Amino acid sequence: MSDRLFIFDTTLRDGEQVPGCQLNTVEKIQVAKALEQLGVDVIEAGFPVSSPGDFKSVVEISKAVTWPTICALTRAVEKDIDVAAEALRFAKRGRIHTGIGTSDSHIKYKFNSTREEIIERAIAATKYAKKYVEDVEFYCEDAGRTDNEYLARVVEAVIKAGATVVNIPDTTGYCLPDEYGAKIKYLMEHVDGVHNAILSTHCHNDLGMATANTVQGVLNGARQVEVTINGIGERAGNTSLEEVAMVFKSHKERDIITNITTNKIYSTSRMVSSLMNMPVQPNKAIVGRNAFAHSSGIHQDGVLKNAQTYEIIDPKDVGIDDNAIVLTARSGRAALKHRLHVLGVDLEQEKLDKVYDEFLKLADRKKDINDDDVLMLVGKDRTATHRIKLEYLQVTSGVGVQSVASICLNLSGVRRYEAAAGNGPVDAGIKAVKKAISNSDMTIQEFLIQAINKGSDDTGKVHMQVEYNGATYYGFSANTDIIAASVEAFVDAINKFIVD
């Protein structure tokens, strides 16, 4: 029988501590609802005593969310616990997360206390929280640097006092995976009554070990993991939810299951990235833009024959439509043939060989090759079959002036002229296009601008991800005018789903 692993998401508490990533209450509720749909078991909604904003967020999230447990953080201080309990009064399932530092450095320098006094405070805080809620989690701050024998005494004491979950944080990201795993194993073997509670991991990524430490913790007995979307968090971040979920989905032989609906991972990642204005690293595992992109010719050939040759995860399992074959100078004939086929062009081998020679010459000059380049090599225009074409664009913008865009779209031979004001020239152009096609239901999920070369007069390329009717479409354009490139990319994406 598989072991159930509980997912405790702290994106809205620990994750939001990243400078510049603060959310308002409405945005926090939006994230909380997405986490509920994703299938997390516990949402740490905030630290109520820290600010009126955090208090309000915990209250409103408690009202808005139905299934996950809503957790509020406190110190081992009665006032903190009182405020947390008040904030959780509307929660269908509430949890108070209280605790104190247990490492010698915390005991001596932070609390000017002794080991015995810390245990007494830990017991008192746990019992006090139990007056309000049945579900009490206790954290042993800096457990990663706490010696195992003393840590076991603390854990045993708070479990006897009524803690239902005990959190073993590697607060500073100091532990190596074997050390952290051994720590959890020691507690499982030496704490009397350990099976009356759940041990939880909470790992930071200061040395890049957060996910590895978390996995080792689980393999040694922890059954709750504290994680964030995209691994965001203080300093170098926290354990990534998507990484842990996919580790155990991929390694079914471990018989550890979560409640995560994995095909919602990518959309949740992008939503959090957008709301927090924190881009996802392109090579980030699971959710990075390049996570399922292949540019090596050998890899491309293998993936085209069978994706399992170089992919251990089906992109659809995390909510990505397909892998990406990126054309570069390292790409082989198989990749070029595949891209041409996708674009509706099938060539005989002799013709393909000639086109491939020209492709290599072009690829040596350009960083990567887009669809326009590929079609140019075979004498075709990608936009020739587009139902919608941008024929004219003029934008006025400046300091102290509202941006206004005027456009002419050719819709299957019929010209439509429109103008719109917006928050900047790109927004104005997008709004004008939406007016011209009488459709404003599509939303931009991702908007990436890159310089192809150096210098202010060189070409910029725009990649745009557009969502419409629950499906995702991609648009691309390159132009020395970055505003024009942005609007062209939007029109390119629209042409993928607009039909007669």
From Swiss-Prot:
It catalyses: 3-methyl-2-oxobutanoate + acetyl-CoA + H2O = (2S)-2-isopropylmalate + CoA + H(+). GO terms for molecular function: 2-isopropylmalate synthase activity; acetyl-CoA C-acetyltransferase activity; manganese ion binding. It comes from the Bacteria. Mn(2+) binds at D14, H202, H204, N238. Coiled coil: none annotated. Residues 5-266 form the Pyruvate carboxyltransferase domain. Its cofactor is Mn(2+). SMART domains: LeuA_dimer. One of its GO terms (cellular component) is cytoplasm. Its main location: cytoplasm. Pfam families: HCS_D2, HMGL-like, LeuA_dimer. Belongs to the alpha-IPM synthase/homocitrate synthase family. LeuA type 1 subfamily. This is 2-isopropylmalate synthase. It comes from Parabacteroides distasonis (strain ATCC 8503 / DSM 20701 / CIP 104284 / JCM 5825 / NCTC 11152).
